[in-house]
Amino acid sequence: MMKVLVVVALLLTLIIYSSSDGIDDLEADELVSLMAHEQTRAKACTPRYYDCSHDRHRCCRSSMFKDVCTCFYPEGGHYKEVCTCQQPKHLEYMEKAADKIKNLFG
């Protein structure tokens, strides 16, 4: 009896899954519009060493990793916090090593 219930549930799930409207393939123009939207979104990032205090999650990506908004207090009596997009050192070293390996092996 349990096997019959499992098979019926499986068939019911497959029928519902195959008849759903949300699984339709994207048409070419929809895909192009999605890509255009993604490129527009990608251009709105904050470059490295620029001020990111207005939006700390909008730093640009390097070739492998995303930069991080790093905040600090500068020396010299300024007590205002300064935030810039920077790449952490360990990620910078990993990116340089990957580039050297890529250049070594073509």
Curated annotation (Swiss-Prot):
One of its GO terms (cellular component) is extracellular region. Its main location: secreted. GO terms for molecular function: toxin activity. Residues 21-41 form a propeptide. Transmembrane segments: none annotated. PROSITE patterns: SPIDER_CSTX. Coiled coil: none annotated. Residues 1-20 form the signal peptide. The keyword Disulfide bond applies. Disulfide bonds join 45-60, 52-69, 59-85, 71-83. Keywords: Disulfide bond, Knottin, Secreted, Signal, Toxin. The keyword Flavoprotein does not apply. It is found in: Secreted. Expressed by the venom gland. The presence of a 'disulfide through disulfide knot' structurally defines this protein as a knottin. Belongs to the neurotoxin 19 (CSTX) family. 02 (D7) subfamily. This is Toxin-like structure LSTX-D9. The lineage of its organism: Eukaryota, Metazoa, Ecdysozoa, Arthropoda, Chelicerata.
